[in-house]
Amino acid sequence: SLYDEKLGQAVLKVAAKAKGYELTIEPPKANLHTGFDVFRSEKKDFKPSKDNKIATVDRNTLKYLDDKADNGKAYYYAVRPIDEDGSYNGTKVTFIGKLSDKVLAAPLPKDKGVTATVAGKGAVSLEFNKTIAAAKYKVTVTAPYDKKFKTIERFVEAGKLAIVGGNKVKVNLTGLTMGKFLAFKLEALEADNTKLVEYGNSFAFMMGAVEKLTAKVNKKSRVLNIKFKAMKGVNGYEAKIVIGGKVKTIKLKKGKKKLNKFMVGSIKLPKKKGNYTFTIRAFKKIGKLKYFGQAITKVVK
């Protein structure tokens, strides 16, 4: 093959599909090519060769599905225009143009776990690893133990996800029924609703935050005393506080006499004053698993 600068350079885009990766080729403006060579490598600094050439396509094939690639792995792709009708000194040759920029194909997430957290009255946030190629996400909400519950479907545009950090994002759902045990099925979709990824199911028990919470620190003993109104229909509570960088549990018990409708607990704080953050949330047991309600967080000194 001989290099011919006149053939120009194509522009390449790559997106993960349910199977493999799809390449979209924007041809050179010169329009002298008869087709394209397609290359794939796990290394960014690869040089085009017969070892990494995966296909030759004709000039009208501007979309190519590499269904042999593992869409859970990251690859670099490139294409270059070719002219198979070239001639040099009376001999038929293939001319090659300039290699396109190498494009990193973003893989589908390997970790498909979803964390569901009750975020307020009728609200749940779902946290998960982003699917780069997704145009939108579909959430299907069901109630496994309520046959009368009407299935809810919500669609969220990929651009409207809240960024948590790293590759983690979250979607917030509102208008859900309190007091229900709900299941959430999350799917990443292409623009035409083709499914890219089906995430693992997540669950939440729709319980609100504890009410009438008070927290007081005894100045002399440096003991933090907390109390809050006991909730109906829960199996227990979890109270955690961060002291010296370590998470400690505040033991809770039912109040006595005038406080018999309250839960109370205490823990000794360090003598040195500082900001100490504690969190309380109720939980419901289903089988051996605990499902937590909305957390409430306070800072004491």
Enumerate the predicted regions with their spans.
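Beta-strand-rich modules
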Residues: S1, D66-N89, L173-L196, L269-K290
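Gram-positive cell-envelope targeting signals
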Residues: V38, F128, V139, L173, ...
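Recognizes extended acidic, P/S/T-rich segments that occur
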Residues: D37-D70, K138-M178, E238-K271
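A generic structural signal for beta-strand entry/edge sites
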Residues: A18-E22, T61-K63, A74, K121-S125, ...
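Short beta-strand/loop motifs in extracellular/secreted proteins, especially
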Residues: T34-D37, A135-Y137, L182, N235-Y237, ...
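Acidic surface patches and DE-rich sequence motifs
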Residues: S1-D4, S49, D58, D83, ...
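Solvent-exposed strand-loop boundary residues in beta-sheet-rich modules
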Residues: K29, E42-F46, D83-S87, I132, ...
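Pro/Thr/Ser/Gly-rich low-complexity, intrinsically disordered linker/stalk tracts
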Residues: S1-N31, N71, S87-A133, M178, ...
